From Swiss-Prot:
One of its GO terms (biological process) is endosome to melanosome transport. Transmembrane segments: none annotated. Component of the BLOC-1 complex, a complex that is required for normal biogenesis of lysosome-related organelles (LRO), such as platelet dense granules and melanosomes. Plays a role in intracellular vesicle trafficking. This is Biogenesis of lysosome-related organelles complex 1 subunit 5. PANTHER family: BIOGENESIS OF LYSOSOME-RELATED ORGANELLES COMPLEX 1 SUBUNIT 5. The gene is BLOC1S5. Belongs to the BLOC1S5 family. Residues 103-196 form a coiled coil.
Amino acid sequence: MSGAGPASPGRSGSALPLPLPLSLSLTGDRKREVPAAGTLLQPIIKDVGEIYSRLLDHRPVIQGEIRYFVKEFEEKRGLRELRVLENLKKTIFETNEDILPKCKQSMHDNLNEVLQRLQAANDTIHKLQEKEHEKRKIQADKLMAGEEKRIAQQETFLQEQQSKREEVDEEHRKAMERLKEQYSEMEKELAKYVSF
């Protein structure tokens, strides 16, 4: 085969017949046969290209499948997202119209009740604090009175001790004087007996 071969498929997906380069320098009869052989190969090459594109080149089929899948996916996704958005809109509308006013009313009612309870608890705590303050004041007064009484008793006790000590000292001094007198008398008597 002089330069002729199977056609290679292009990127476009269709097989184009290749031109047959005929650079043969043949004599006159042969020159007439070569173009006739080239024209005979053209339909074969074309058929081979079509067979290749039908059997081996799946790009058009795959592209069609991809387009169909994308179209179906976008339609289903669009409908699903539309349903989600409608459900969200419905939920928001119900929340704004029904639930939010109920929550506000319930919160207002409960807050009033809680506020009243807090006020009552605050009053009770204030009363308890006043009672506790009064108890502490009474207790402090009792402690001060007890302290003053103890100080007075201590002063009285110290004064009594001082007077008793003075009495004891006085008695001791008198007793010492008596003993001195007694000893001096005894010494005088002894002196009388010694002189004998």
